[in-house]
């Protein structure tokens, strides 16, 4: 009888474990199926400002790197259809729970290539680790300048050719300007958002924010010259939300 009870208990325990695992798998599948996205286009209304060519004569290496492809300022890049590149889109209201606290595992890279920052605008999450690398055979000095009142600490670090990546993270949301003390034309941004998915527009001004749970949200669009705009967006299961933005040229 004792052995029969043991056998029965083992069978019941196995069934419970199987049911629990099946529920977890089904939950993941339902969650994945229910995850939506927000898509749209960001455009400039009006004439785009002229982006001046960059004088790199201070460093012969940089001049040679752009001998066949002259470099220009990148504050405003507009595609043929009026789409704005390098606009960061993020969810500024409506997210709850783990969506606000889970830090992405991916480590984005901010590279120094041909004496410019690539990408020009790097979007990342609070506490998300990122790497600063150099592809150049000339020394650089990366100098982000956040507002210390936010909790983000400014730093200034040299990176000679062949140096290992610099690994950092930011503690608070902020639009952080990045410069190079050696090459004054080098200029970029770190856009640090507080939790949740985000996206950066491509050369045509298009973007997609993935992994958005169904719900009502406020989406913010940030551009380094034109500032921010917001829109209310609803995402339903299996149906993406849409938010198009238009900035007025100055």
Each model region followed by its residue ranges:
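N-terminal secretory signal peptides that target proteins for export/translocation
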Residues: 1-8
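Extracytoplasmic copper-binding redox domains, predominantly the cupredoxin/blue-copper superfamily
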Residues: 27-250
């Amino acid at each position: 009888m004792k052995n029969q009870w043991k056998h029965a208990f083992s069978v019941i325990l196995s069934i419970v474990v199987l049911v629990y695992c099946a529920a977890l798998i089904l939950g993941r599948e339902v969650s994945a199926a229910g995850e939506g996205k927000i898509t749209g286009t960001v455009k400039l209304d009006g004439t785009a400002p002229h982006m001046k060519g960059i004088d790199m004569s201070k460093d012969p290496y940089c001049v040679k790197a752009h001998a066949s492809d002259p470099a220009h300022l990148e504050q405003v890049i507009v595609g043929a259809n009026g789409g704005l590149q390098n606009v960061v889109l993020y969810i500024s209201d409506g997210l709850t729970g783990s969506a606000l606290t889970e830090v992405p595992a991916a480590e984005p890279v901010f590279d120094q290539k041909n004496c410019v920052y690539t990408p020009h605008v790097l979007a990342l999450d609070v506490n998300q680790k990122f790497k600063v690398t150099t592809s150049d055979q000339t020394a650089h000095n990366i100098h982000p300048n956040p507002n210390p009142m936010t909790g983000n600490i400014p730093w200034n670090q040299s990176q000679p050719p062949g140096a290992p990546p610099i690994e950092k993270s930011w503690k608070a949301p902020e639009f952080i300007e990045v410069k190079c003390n050696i090459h004054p034309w080098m200029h970029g941004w770190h856009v640090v958002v507080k939790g949740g998915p985000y996206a950066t527009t491509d050369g045509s001004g298009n973007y997609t924010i993935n992994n958005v749970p169904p719900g009502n949200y406020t989406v913010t669009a940030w551009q380094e010259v034109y500032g921010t705009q917001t829109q209310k967006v609803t995402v339903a299961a299996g149906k993406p939300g849409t938010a198009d933005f238009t900035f007025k040229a100055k």
